[in-house]
A protein has these predicted regions:
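Ser/Thr-centric signal marking residues that sit
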Residues: 28, 52, 70
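Short, Lys/Arg-enriched anionic-surface-contact patches
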Residues: 18-41, 66
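Short, basic interhelical loop/turn and adjoining N-cap
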Residues: 57, 61-74
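Intrinsically disordered, low-complexity basic tails/linkers immediately adjacent to helix-turn-helix/homeobox/MYB/SANT
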Residues: 66, 77-129
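Short, amphipathic alpha-helical "recognition" segments used to contact nucleic acids or chromatin
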Residues: 38-54
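Solvent-exposed, charged helical/coil patches
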Residues: 1-3
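Helix-turn-helix DNA-binding elements, focusing on the entry/boundary residues of the two helices
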Residues: 13, 55-57
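N-terminal positioning helix adjacent to the helix-turn-helix/winged-helix DNA-binding module
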Residues: 8, 12, 40-41
Length: 129
């Protein structure tokens, strides 16, 4: 992983910790199962897999104690949640807006998410799960 990608991961950790009100160490260690920590971990795993191209069997380098099967489960579960729960989709779009502008711009171009959904998000409000 080059320096740019390392910085992307650090920014993502910071944004996730602010969004889900937890410490970076709480979601990078497989110790707690509180809802906000699990959701923060799920965001981080999905971001690493989808946008940083980290393989499932290498997730253990970023989240201590992570098994590849757990990583696969979290990615599939997160995709299902984005499809069924609009608040999770809004949080994901908000996360990309603050963490990675390149991916946010790609998301706006991608036809999977309508522009109306992206434009109607109030980025100043706090989304609470």
């Amino acid at each position: 992983m080059n320096q740019y990608e390392k910085e992307k991961v650090e920014i993502a950790k910071f944004v996730i910790s602010k969004m889900w009100d937890c410490n970076e160490s709480q979601f990078t260690l497989m110790k707690k199962r509180n809802t906000n920590i699990v959701m923060a971990r799920r965001f981080f795993i999905y971001y690493l897999w989808k946008h940083c191209e980290v393989k499932h069997n290498r997730m253990k380098d970023y989240i201590h104690g992570m098994n590849h099967a757990t990583s696969i489960y979290h990615c599939r579960k997160f995709e299902q949640e984005m499809e069924f729960y609009k608040d999770i989709l809004k949080k994901w779009i908000t996360f990309l807006y603050y963490a990675d502008q390149r991916e946010y711009q790609k998301l706006k171009i991608d036809m999977k998410y309508p522009i109306e959904t992206i434009n109607n998000i109030d980025f100043n409000s706090n989304y609470i799960y």
